[in-house]
Every structure is written in C-alpha cells, then in structure tokens.
C-alpha cells in the first residue's frame, strides 16, 4: 500500500474512533464464493448498515421477479409519476408522464443510479412507495435477509432503511443464480441518452479484470458502499464493502478483497453465508461525522481518476480482532493494480417504446444543445451580475466553495482596500467626465 493511501486510511480510522463506539470496530466487508455460498472473508458481516443506493439491487430483483412470473415484460412501458419526478439527484430529470421501457429503466437504474427511475419502477409495480417497499420486504424475508428492511426503492435517507453485508451478498447471489439471462444488466460500462453519456458508478467495471457487477451506493450516513462481483478462471466471487471513506477507497478495498479471494480456496472449514452469527448491534451507525462533516472537498459518488496502486501488504484491519480472515492470507501477498477504465461503447437508452430514428436523434440533440446553451447563457449572466455587485463593494474577499477546496491549493484570499490617502471623491469625478464625454458623443450624432 503506498504511503498516501496508508495515511488516508489511518486518518479515517482515527476519525472513526473519535466518532463514537459504534464506529470503533471498523466497517463491514465480506467475500463469498457464488457457487458454494461459502464465506472466504467476513468482518462485521451482520452489523446493520444504511444501504444507500445498493437498495436498487432489491428494486431490480422485485422487477425481474415480476418479469419471471409473466406479470411484466422487459418491453412494458412505465410512466414517470409526479412523485418520482420530484426526487433529488442522482436523477435523469424525466418529466411526469414520460414513458420508458422496463429494460431501459433497469439499465439507467444500475448504471446512472437514477432515483427518479427507481421511483418510477416502484410506482408502476407497487402502486406507491409503500406498496413497493412491502414487495421488497416480502422478497427479503423469503430470501433469508433477516437483517434488512426497506422503506423506499432508491435508498435515499430514511432511518427505517437498513441491511447487512451478509444480506446483500444473499441478494447478489440470488440475482446471479435466479436470473442468469439478465446478468449483462449489471456490468454495462456506460449508457447514452441522447447526447448524454453516463458511465457506471462502479469503479471496478472496466478496470478490474473479470469485474462483472453490481451496484454502488452513497449517502453521508452510510459512507461508500458497493456490492461487487468478479469472475476468474470460471470462479465467481461476491465482495461487499460498506462504509468506505471515499469512492476510491471503496474501489481499492473491493479489488484487494477480490485478489485475496481468488488466491484462497474454499474447504469445509469455511462457513456458509447463511450461518454467519447475528450481530449484537440493533441499529446502523451514522457515518455522517466521518464522511461528510469534515474539512475538505465534498464527497462524490463516482471515482476520481485513479493512479495505479500496488499493495503487497495485508488489508488493513485497524480496529477489530473479530475477523474471519482468508486462509493462509499472510503467506500469499497480492499485487493489486488498478489503472484507468478501458474505453467502452455506451448502450443507448431512450424513452418510449421504440428507439428513436436518426431524425429524432438529431432533433433531440439539437434540443439538448439549445438547452445547454441557454443554461450557459444564464450562468454567464448570473456571473456577470454577481461580478458587478462585487465591484461595488469596497472590501472584496474571494470565497472558496467547499467543493473547490481540493483545487485551491496555493490560492490565497486577497482583500482589496482603498489606498491610504486616496481621494474618495475620485470615482465621482471620473463618472462626471464620462458623462460629459457621453453627452458630447450624443451631440455629435
């Protein structure tokens, strides 16, 4: 592990220790073999946690179950409701009444993680958020997800939402085993809607060899979550990471766990996923103080560009000794290297039943271009207006926004004050001269 990354992880550990006893035991991590259902590595695997957008895996499961039963098809048109359209980002921004096929909705859901699309699926299948949540919880109970409860289809903050690493691995395994014909949904590198290209928020897709799914999630209270799958030499593994301090750390931790998992073998001593002991904790910890209420740039769901990182050390276990580690882990150092994503051809998605014609695509592109130009013009006008207002003030101190702190290294705040002894009436004289000049020009015309 390089020095900078070690310092970041250590800083997170210290922050977690300061954040309370609930955080002092580290964050959940789990590696499971799909074929056998046996556990290769587990840490706090049954502790309750806020799921954030990995909730959308259960939304997908409920939808695919309806397709399997014949109640829906992948061509079924879903209608965007007022409630769905009103949800906060991440979203597509579809207007109420817009219709979209279920297959396109699922692609957008799993790649873009759009909350308005999740709610559209829920409203059309369950009749309402509560109705769909009841379907989600019924499926969770049937699958044996004993530590999970879902209150909405998207994972936006709600204290009633909770899950565990174990339960999400059960769900991922069910999706893989029960719906093999739809596995391609989970490893789409990017989707394209009109001129917009949206890449998968899963930082392993296109970067980790063999990565083939599934879903990321992030809210301040959960930290950075991921349920990931990868295949190597015919062997399929599921890795769950909950509560990572950043999107990059989430990706790197999952990659390290996969490497160690593929270097380990399952035998009779490995417990089955369903046999993991229950946690003594009843409620999820709130990670907000560690993840969001701290100095620095605002956390982002997607990975920033990552330089390849090598790791020939054990996965840092900074807190807990109650961990089921990989067999022979210390004897098998691994080298985890992640480079930039490989280029992918985005899958086109659209609204309506049929894909748009070339003429319709051109018209849509023109409309989007006009809308973008209008937004830029509005931003420019707003910036110009703010600049004029700032120019009127005698003292001006540039303000660095929270999200720009990472870009502002070396930048200092400058206070502009009137020079001592300067004639305060000078600007007025200048204005008078300008007015006289203007009158002269008017007279000449």
Where are these regions (language model features)?
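Active-site-adjacent loops and short helices of periplasmic peptidoglycan-processing enzymes
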Residues: 14-166, 175-176
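Bacterial N-terminal signal peptides that target proteins for export
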Residues: 1-10
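Extended interaction regions within the primary functional domain
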Residues: 11, 15, 192
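Domain-terminus/edge residues, biased toward the C-terminal soluble/receptor-binding domains
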Residues: 146-149, 157-162, 166-421, 428-429, ...
């Amino acid at each position: 592990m390089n020095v900078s990354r070690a310092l970041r992880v250590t800083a997170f550990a210290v922050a977690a220790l300061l954040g309370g006893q609930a955080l002092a035991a580290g964050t959940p991590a789990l590696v499971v073999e799909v074929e056998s259902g046996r556990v290769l590595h587990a840490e706090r695997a049954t502790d309750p946690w806020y799921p954030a957008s990995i909730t959308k895996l259960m939304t997908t499961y409920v939808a695919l179950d309806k397709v399997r039963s014949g109640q829906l098809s992948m061509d079924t048109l879903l209608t965007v409701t007022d409630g769905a359209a009103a949800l906060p980002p991440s979203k597509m921004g579809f207007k109420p009444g817009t219709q979209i096929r279920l297959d396109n909705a699922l692609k957008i859901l799993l790649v873009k993680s759009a909350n308005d699309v999740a709610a559209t699926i829920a409203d059309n299948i369950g009749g309402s958020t509560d109705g769909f949540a009841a379907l989600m919880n019924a499926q969770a109970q049937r699958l044996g997800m004993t530590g999970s409860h879902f209150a909405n289809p998207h994972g936006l903050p709600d204290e009633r939402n909770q899950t565990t690493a174990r339960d999400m691995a059960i769900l991922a395994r069910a999706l893989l085993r029960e719906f093999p014909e739809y596995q391609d949904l989970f490893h789409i590198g990017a989707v394209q809607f009109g001129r917009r290209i949206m890449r998968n928020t899963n930082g392993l897709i296109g970067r980790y060899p063999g990565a083939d799914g599934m879903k990321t999630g992030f809210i301040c209270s959960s930290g950075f979550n991921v349920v990931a799958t990868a295949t190597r030499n015919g062997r399929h593994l599921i890795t769950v990471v909950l509560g990572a301090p950043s999107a990059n750390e989430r990706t790197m931790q999952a990659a390290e766990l996969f490497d160690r998992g593929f270097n380990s073998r399952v035998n009779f001593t490995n417990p089955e996923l369903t046999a993991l002991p229950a946690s003594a904790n009843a409620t999820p910890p709130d990670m907000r103080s560690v993840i969001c209420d701290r100095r620095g740039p605002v956390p982002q769901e997607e990975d920033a560009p990552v330089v390849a990182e090598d790791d020939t050390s054990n996965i840092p276990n900074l807190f807990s000794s109650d961990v089921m580690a990989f067999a022979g882990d210390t004897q098998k150092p691994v080298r985890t290297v992640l480079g930039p994503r490989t280029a992918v051809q985005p899958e086109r998605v659209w609204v309506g039943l049929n894909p748009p014609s070339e003429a319709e695509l051109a018209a849509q592109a023109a409309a989007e271009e006009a809308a973008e130009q209008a937004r830029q013009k509005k931003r420019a006008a707003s910036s110009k207006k703010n600049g004029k207002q700032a120019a009127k003030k005698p003292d001006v101190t540039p303000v660095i926004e929270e999200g720009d702190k990472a870009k502002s290294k070396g930048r200092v705040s400058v206070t502009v004050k009137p020079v001592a002894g300067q004639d305060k009436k000078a600007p007025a004289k200048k204005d008078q001269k300008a007015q006289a000049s203007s009158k002269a020009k008017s007279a000449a015309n």
